[in-house]
């Protein structure tokens, strides 16, 4: 099981990216964020501090997810 991180991404400290997750190019993953298994964060998206994504979630291109959100 492999996670994939695209080019020119920013992954801040204490961010957790689990198995089979895909972070496309130019994404910013903030501190204390959990990207659960098989989730996809599409190109150019910002995922705020403390966000948790459920397994298999797809975050659309150029999305902005507010800090502390739960994405189902």
What are these regions, as identified by a protein language model?
Residues 1-72:
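Structural signal for interior beta-strand "rungs" in well-ordered beta-sheet cores
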